[in-house]
Amino acid sequence: MIKQLWNKIPFTDLFLEASTWGRIRNGVTKRNIKIYTRKDSGYRYFSTYVNEKIKTTYVHRCVMAAHNPINGYEKLDVNHIDFNPSNNKISNLEWCTESENMQHSIRNGR
């Protein structure tokens, strides 16, 4: 079994960490953040309260930004290789363009 590693999520003002297993935690207290699943798409997300507003953030973007950061990632999609949007393990995710993401779906009959 691959060891779970934690890295800071670079695009949040809060000190949050994402694991290679697709978990999110508070980097100070080390307590896990509650993760929800969108009923319409199956994507996993969490909510934070920043500047008196609720901000929703997708787990797959956090995992990739924390463990596989690249320049310009804000403009890229994250592809779930196995088509399971709730599988946010780093081994199942890859950066891609919107076009590449669509081609991946078409090639695999999705």
In which residue ranges do the predicted regions lie?
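Conserved recognition-core residues within compact binding domains
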Residues: M1-D77, D82-R110
